[in-house]
Amino acid sequence: MSINIRDPLIVSRVVGDVLDPFNRSITLKVTYGQREVTNGLDLRPSQVQNKPRVEIGGEDLRNFYTLVMVDPDVPSPSNPHLREYLHWLVTDIPATTGTTFGNEIVCYENPSPTAGIHRVVFILFRQLGRQTVYAPGWRQNFNTREFAEIYNLGLPVAAVFYNCQRESGCGGRRL
């Protein structure tokens, strides 16, 4: 990643908290309904209830990718002791396709933050080939860097994040 201090992934500390610097080399398009995720986009939990549509660029169907979706701000940005929370894990996604053609290792769980503004990050890795990946025992305290090292994925080839916070009018005092 050519270091650009204005890059939203750096400004938001996604690079640092979740990822090491990397060079974007493939297109990653994540869409909830009609809303395409761009870095720093604000989405409400009600807008991310359903699994997003994910499209991956590339030119060679023989290349495979792994998509990781995490929230590094669980349970709250000021006390992220469960960092990172794994929301979704899909492997063996052929280039030029999307997650529907991959192998869902951990099913999609929609973000539902209870305190503060959470960053929800989609990270795409290029695989060396098809491989067997095991689901982690739990979603909390997932470590993207460690996962990439275990499965020899190297640095990411793309990433995008959105911000999500509790819906206003949820919870509170009841009489």
UniProtKB/Swiss-Prot annotation:
Principal location: cytoplasm
Annotated InterPro entries: PEBP, PEBP-like_sf, PEBP_euk, Phosphatidylethanolamine-bd_CS
Pfam family, one: PBP
Gene Ontology cellular component list: cytoplasm; endoplasmic reticulum; nucleus
Domain of life, per lineage: Eukaryota
Keyword check for Membrane: no
BP GO annotations: cell differentiation; flower development; meristem determinacy; photoperiodism, flowering; positive regulation of flower development; regulation of flower development; regulation of stomatal movement
CDD domains, A to Z: PEBP_euk
Induction / repression: Levels follow a circadian cycle with a progressive accumulation during the day time. By light. Expression is delayed and reduced under SD conditions. Repressed by FLC. Up-Regulated by VOZ1 and/or VOZ2. Up-regulated by APL/FE. Down-regulated by the H3K36me2 modification at the FT locus produced by the interaction between EFM and JMJ30. Repressed by MYB56.
Tissues and organs where the protein is expressed, per its UniProt entry: Mostly localized in leaves vasculature.
GO molecular function: phosphatidylethanolamine binding
Cell compartments where the protein resides: Cytoplasm; Nucleus; Endoplasmic reticulum
Protein keywords: Cytoplasm, Developmental protein, Differentiation, Endoplasmic reticulum, Flowering, Nucleus
Miscellaneous section: Mutagenesis of Tyr-85 to His converts the activator of flowering 'FLOWERING LOCUS T' into a 'TERMINAL FLOWER 1'-like repressor of flowering.
Quaternary organization: Interacts with FD/BZIP14 and FDP/BZIP27. Interacts with FTIP1/MCTP1 in phloem companion cells. Interacts with NAKR1.
Function summary: Component of the mobile flower-promoting signal (floral stimulus or florigen). Promotes the transition from vegetative growth to flowering. Required for 'SEPALLATA3' (SEP3) and 'FRUITFULL' (FUL) accumulation in mature rosette leaves. Seems to acts in parallel with 'LEAFY' to induce flowering by regulating 'APETALA1'. Translated in leaves and then transported to the shoot apical meristem where it activates the transcription of several floral meristem identity genes. May play a role in both the autonomous and the long-day flowering pathways.
Family named by the database record: Belongs to the phosphatidylethanolamine-binding protein family.
Name listed for the protein in its UniProt record: Protein FLOWERING LOCUS T
Organism encoding this protein: Arabidopsis thaliana
